[in-house]
């Protein structure tokens, strides 16, 4: 994957001047200062005020560029100008939040699986393992949001009476569409839901039944299943994309910039003087070839702050949903998600949000968001850092996921006034502006999508 998931530690915003740098690194969460640097790169850029262009997205007509649909399942595009936090938010949402249809194979408290009910299984695979394999079968439903689980039933019964091994595949599953109370269910061609591979023309392999021996009962498998709606955040079976849902920094093809990076690499890592290297063409060619294999990726487009602003996206669908739809749906979901928090500065808080004084030596407040993770935390932190720190509306912003097994995210906001309404206003403003940004992106995507 091209981007590293956000850290679990609270990540503070950059200081506004070198004079504000702390004398020593904090040893604990409580000792975090109001404006600590996040990296050495930010230390160097700390005294440079963020340009206005970084504070709001560019016009919607220029966000998505070079959209190329290489196949029915593969899409490439460039997202610019924006920041890495927003690009990563889009990537993570496509992976975890876009809905698809699958068989749930979770083990319930009674020991059974939720959507897959195995009644006969004489294979070496345990029921749990077999249900897991069944749950990973891609089910082709083009409009998952309109899916009604009660309309279709899936079942399979295979017995191997022969002496040869028998493959049991998804194509063996029988699909029935339920009709009226007095009507017989309609048999539906299973190829509608389980597409064969275009090369082998086979469907997904579930298990293998060994050949029958004279002294033994034949191996068999029998189950029924219900297909339901879910997301990749719940289980990887519902992920609409492959591992090729990623982005990289757009390469800077400026020859002078590339030469500068090459010279720095020679001096720092190879201990070679670039001028002296001109006298040895063979050695120069070797080093240039080595540079082009990996180090050239450090030559990417940067803004005035030295941060990447252009991102090359690749989105590959597992074959059920089109990549164009996946991007559009992710933007729609992001807009709806942040809008839930756009009014926390007025009236009662949503049931999923709690506010308490910050557990630190600073004036501020901790916002605990239920059922949120790094995606929302990094999004809000990025916008507030870019837009509210310099204007002194807040003094600090950072987030963390307190525990990987608890479905919650903590966002810490520092305010000089010490008033919770000021902190709530900052978070609400971030939510509203992010919602507007993703609305603009949706409009831009609709105008260029292929």
Task: Annotate each predicted stretch with a short phrase.
Residues 2-22, 29, 33-450:
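Protein-protein interaction/assembly regions in multi-subunit complexes
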């Amino acid at each position: 994957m091209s981007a590293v998931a956000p850290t679990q530690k609270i990540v503070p915003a950059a200081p506004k001047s070198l004079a504000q740098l702390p004398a020593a690194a904090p040893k604990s969460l409580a000792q975090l200062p109001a404006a600590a640097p996040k990296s050495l790169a930010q230390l160097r850029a700390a005294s440079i005020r963020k340009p206005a262009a970084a504070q709001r997205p560019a016009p919607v007509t220029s966000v998505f560029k070079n959209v190329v649909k290489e196949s029915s399942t593969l899409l490439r595009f460039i997202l610019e100008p924006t920041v890495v936090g927003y690009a990563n938010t889009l990537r993570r949402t496509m992976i975890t939040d876009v809905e698809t249809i699958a068989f749930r194979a979770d083990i319930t408290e009674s020991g059974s699986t939720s959507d897959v009910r195995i009644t006969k299984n004489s294979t070496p695979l345990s029921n749990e393992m077999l249900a897991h394999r069944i749950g990973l079968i891609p089910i082709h439903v083009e409009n998952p949001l309109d899916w009604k689980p009660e309309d279709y039933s899936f079942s399979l019964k295979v017995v191997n009476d022969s002496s040869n091994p028998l493959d049991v595949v998804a194509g063996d599953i029988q699909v029935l569409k339920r009709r009226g109370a007095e009507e017989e269910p309609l048999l539906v061609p299973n190829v509608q839901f389980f597409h064969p591979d275009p090369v082998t023309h086979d469907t997904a392999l579930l298990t293998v039944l060994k050949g029958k021996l004279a002294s033994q009962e034949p191996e068999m498998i029998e189950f029924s299943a219900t297909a339901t709606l879910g997301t990749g955040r719940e289980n990887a079976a519902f992920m609409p994309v492959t591992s090729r849902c990623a982005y990289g920094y757009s390469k800077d093809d400026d020859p002078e910039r590339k030469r500068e990076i090459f010279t720095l690499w020679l001096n720092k890592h190879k201990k070679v003087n670039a001028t002296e290297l001109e006298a040895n063409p063979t050695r120069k060619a070797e080093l240039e070839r080595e540079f082009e294999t990996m180090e050239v990726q450090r030559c990417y487009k940067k803004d005035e702050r030295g941060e990447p602003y252009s991102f090359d996206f690749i989105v590959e669908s597992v074959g059920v949903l089109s990549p164009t739809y996946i991007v559009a749906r992710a933007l729609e979901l992001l807009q709806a998600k942040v809008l839930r928090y756009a009014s926390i500065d007025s009236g009662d808080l949503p049931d999923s949000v709690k506010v308490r004084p910050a557990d630190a030596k600073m004036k501020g407040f901790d916002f605990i968001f239920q059922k949120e993770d790094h995606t929302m935390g990094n999004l809000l932190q990025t916008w507030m850092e870019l837009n509210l720190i310099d204007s002194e509306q807040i003094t600090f912003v950072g987030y963390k996921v307190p525990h990987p097994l608890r479905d919650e995210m903590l966002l810490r906001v520092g305010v000089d006034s010490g008033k919770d309404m000021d902190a709530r206003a900052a978070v609400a403003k971030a939510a509203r502006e992010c919602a507007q940004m993703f609305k603009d992106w949706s409009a831009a995507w609709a105008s260029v999508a292929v």
